[in-house]
A protein has these predicted regions:
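N-terminal capping segment at the start of a domain
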Residues: 5-21, 172-173
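Cofactor-binding active-site loop characterized by glycine-rich and histidine/acidic residues
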Residues: 15, 27-161
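Generic beta-sheet signal
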Residues: 55-57, 136-140, 167, 220-228
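Short acidic, glycine/serine/threonine-rich loops at helix termini
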Residues: 69-71, 151-153, 179-183, 235-241
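Conserved thiamine diphosphate
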Residues: 134, 182-211, 263
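A short alpha/beta connector and helix-capping loop motif
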Residues: 149-174, 223-228
Length: 265
């Protein structure tokens, strides 16, 4: 992994250890996606986090909120000292699931928690910006398991029907529900719903950047979708092999072990 991919994972591990909470497998599967969006793709800056013309990032798979804080720390919106000192504490703004009401200055765009709600929220933002004729683009990160929710497919129908080519749905396809529900070919399903779809390696930052740029350049009144092929716990051998890390925070000894694995990856 490149240095920034390692740093983001190290910081996510540290924050999880500090608050003794977090879904680290899910976090590690999407960190590269979130970083590429903020660093290479989105029209967004910490200094203008409330600008009307900004791009929006909606995290629908809220269990991966610990993937968002390290990225926003790197982009200068938060400090590691502030986040690590308060994350997960009672009434803290740094919740394990995002809470936009605690960030009046911007930076967090949605409340997360109930799965299947981020996409309809993102569709509403994209539709409003389309009506206002704003240049804003909306990106929404969803887990593959969220497509068990009917709200996801209802939102896809609406997005295609309203010709929201300012919307990009990103599916973190880490195959977390395959043992329970066969999701089939997600690319074919989304294409049938009227999306322009591309599949890519969700851990290859160059490939992600190219895919996002190619889709954004297409103005054809069709919403976009990226199927990002990912691995749960990517960057840590222990987390990829042991599903207990879906929802487990490291103690001091485990933190050292996992950080060493990330550094060696």
């Amino acid at each position: 992994m490149n240095p920034i991919a390692k740093k983001l994972r190290q910081n996510a591990l540290f924050l999880s250890h500090k608050c003794q909470d977090g879904n680290l497998q899910s976090v590690f599967s999407c960190l590269d996606i979130v970083w590429v969006l903020y660093d290479k793709i989105m029209n967004w800056s910490a200094a203008q986090a409330k600008a009307e013309y900004r791009d929006f990032f909606i995290i629908s798979k809220g269990q991966a909120t610990l993937a968002l804080y390290p990225v926003l720390i790197e982009k200068g919106l938060f400090s590691m000292e502030d986040v690590s000192s308060h994350i997960g504490q009672f009434n803290s703004r740094y919740c394990i699931q995002t809470d936009l009401t605690k960030f009046p200055e911007g930076g967090i765009e949605n409340n997360a928690g109930s799965l299947g709600h981020g996409l309809p929220f993102a569709v509403g933002i994209a539709y409003a910006n389309k009506v206002k004729k704003l240049p804003s683009y909306t990106y929404v990160l969803c887990g593959d398991g969220e497509f068990c929710e009917g709200t996801m497919w209802e939102s896809c129908l609406f997005a295609a029907g309203k010709k929201l080519d300012n919307l990009c749905l990103i599916v973190d396809d880490n195959r977390s529900v395959g043992a329970m529900v066969d999701m089939g070919n997600m690319a074919q399903k989304l294409a049938a719903f009227g999306f322009d779809v591309k599949e890519t390696d969700g851990h290859n930052m160059d490939a992600l950047e190219q895919t996002f740029k190619e889709l954004r350049a297409v103005k054809n009144n069709r919403p976009k979708a990226v199927i990002a092929k990912t691995v749960r716990g990517y960057g840590s051998k222990t987390m990829t092999e042991k599903d207990i890390w879906f929802h487990k925070a490291p103690n001091a000894e485990e933190l050292k072990q996992l950080q060493a694995e990330v550094e060696a990856a």
